[in-house]
Amino acid sequence: MSFRTVCTTLGASLELNFFRVCNPARPTTIQDWLQERINAVAASISDIRLLLRVKSLPKSSESRRVFITGGTGYIGSALIPILLERDHRVRVLVRPGSKAKLPAACEVVSGDALDANTYRQVIRPSDTFIHLVGVPHPSPAKGAQFRAVDMVSGREAISACAELGMRHFIYLSVAHPAPLRIMKDYIAVRAECEQMIQERHLNATIIRPWYVLGPGHRWPYLLLPFYKVCEWLPFTRAGALRLGLVTLEQLILALVQAVESPIQGTRVVGVPEIRSAALNLPREITRQTA
């Protein structure tokens, strides 16, 4: 049985549960409210653990000026404190009137991620641009939203950075190709944005996780035995590694590594590289300071 067949069968059986997790309803019972509070505490503990780990790592000798779109979401809110801890200067784009809570040490600028004309003039003097904008809680029913938000915001960011000659563009994409058709629109939009990056000749790092494990996103731990078997079998190994699970901590460290090691041309960071970022980050810093 091929990895495609296994994933298609498994995906069909888990699709309903997957999208119930990704699209939780507003809390309507005490149990729902308690679960939200538990998730919030778990997120705080996870953030503290990650911060302590980062504190133990050597710092880069060069501070970056980083501009972030989508910085108030699940990934961005975990990434920003880590970049600040590592002495990078962070400027975050937020919607006008947004009450998003961001660390006091970062600079907040207002603009619309769907229209680069509202923020192009405040990107500089940043040398690194991280694009994290995406429709929250993605599901197959949100194909139109992926094109209206993910595609448009990506196109605007890519265009603005190409015009400004941005030193390094970092794009959070998704692992592909993938056999599961349930997220084909989501994957297609990110593949198109990757193509735009290539066409505009940006110096870019494209990061391709599949599913990110973290607070409120832990049910796929149940799939780990399945993944281990598929990674062990020669005929399913490549697909299992490409579409493997990564933790929020691993993804944040991969983003930090990308920030601190700009590239000429295009670099694609897949699941295996994301998983090894915690090991590679100290080595890269040692190499830079040697």
Where do the language-model regions lie?
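Core catalytic loop region at the nicotinamide-binding pocket of NAD(P)H-dependent oxidoreductases
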Residues: 243, 247-249, 253-285
